[in-house]
């Protein structure tokens, strides 16, 4: 994972956990009987209300039940993507003045994600302290929240300057609405008391990228939230597979702050006194669906960017990296042209704009200006939930989603048509023999070579003779031979040039001159084709 100090852009999200108020200092309303501020440093777990004998019995049974669940935390949250059995063969095709060779290789990706991305469609299910089942629904980013009575919990925020007293809040009844009110209270407390001392809080940037080849591969990389994201990004997997475009997907998490939940000292601490083991069993809490809780939520902005180029160059990724980082490519014509002729599409979640999701298209030259917007947190630039972390309730261990997928990596290379320019100005009769191989591929990807010859081979040419031989992009192993007639009985023909297995170039200039006894030649290249 790369950490870039990039600044992302204006993001949107309607269901904000931090409500923007008409006046800057208005604090969101909440039920003070449910959300209270701890008067002193809060202990590791919030103080529990004394339990009745029945409630103690329920707690003991819940602890015994959850502690007794037998599951493998390393295999319970797994996304298994596509399995590749057949790799399509190598192929080539003519495209205008180029011959394109497309090659495919089997690849695999294995990604462990502790943070699960949030997008608007599921944000209502996500809040700090939520009790969820660690199962397929969580892997699919559709957490199944347990509808049970909850005990109190303590939230904390990591905004700078806040004391241990101010950065925590005690939530008596942690329903979603009460938790969101508590989050608003914590953040507004910082806005009121600490924002002047810390006027420019730069967001923490979490950056990752992946050249795109299949949806399954990108889901394994970025999580199952990418399914919904791609409805807007529209990665062109068909064109990528055909070798017609190269696309890269980049994910930015611009994190303003994290809301954390204190770890419970035992599983029962997260349940109200009336909740029983039988209720949990009836709700499907078992070894296949063990309980977990959202231990941390990151608030900020999430940006997904698709970079797209029709270039067949192997420098496309380098060009994309330069465009994103602002690195100068002055002097590198190839990188400059790739950047100039590439485009991007950005899907942005969060921020102060009115729309839920903002979608922006443009060329790469405009992208960095967009990314520079909204680099710091303030009241007018609020964050939204962009990712969350879950822990198993049994032992507070981190619940890591393991994403695996195989995919076909497609690479393409273009070979531009070229030509050989012949110039004969020598004082003699000359003959040429020019030949080459033209390459193609059969249905199994095996290379087929067809030998080709110039139609004027071994025809006598007098000075001054010029001609151009046009070669297709799939021409290989070019041979150029010329001889001159000396008039000498013992050496009637003398070799002037004999160059073999030459590469295809845009312009190859072959000249012969001189006399019968002293023939000369040159073989020069203009604009070599890489």
Swiss-Prot record:
GO terms for molecular function: cholesterol binding; toxin activity. Its main location: secreted. It is a multi-pass membrane protein. GO terms for biological process: killing of cells of another organism. The chain crosses the membrane at residues 215-228, 235-244, 313-322, 330-342. It is found in: Secreted; Host cell membrane. GO terms for cellular component: extracellular region; host cell plasma membrane; membrane. Coiled coil: none annotated. The keyword Isomerase does not apply. It holds the Pfam family Thiol_cytolys_C. Residues 1-25 form the signal peptide. Belongs to the cholesterol-dependent cytolysin family. A cholesterol-dependent toxin that causes cytolysis by forming pores in cholesterol containing host membranes. L.seeligeri is non-pathogenic, perhaps in part because this protein is about 25% as toxic as listeriolysin O. Mutating a single residue in the undecapeptide increases toxicity 2-fold. After binding to target membranes, the protein undergoes a major conformation change, leading to its insertion in the host membrane and formation of an oligomeric pore complex. Homooligomeric pore complex of 35 to 50 subunits; when inserted in the host membrane. This is Seeligeriolysin. It comes from Listeria seeligeri. The gene is lso.
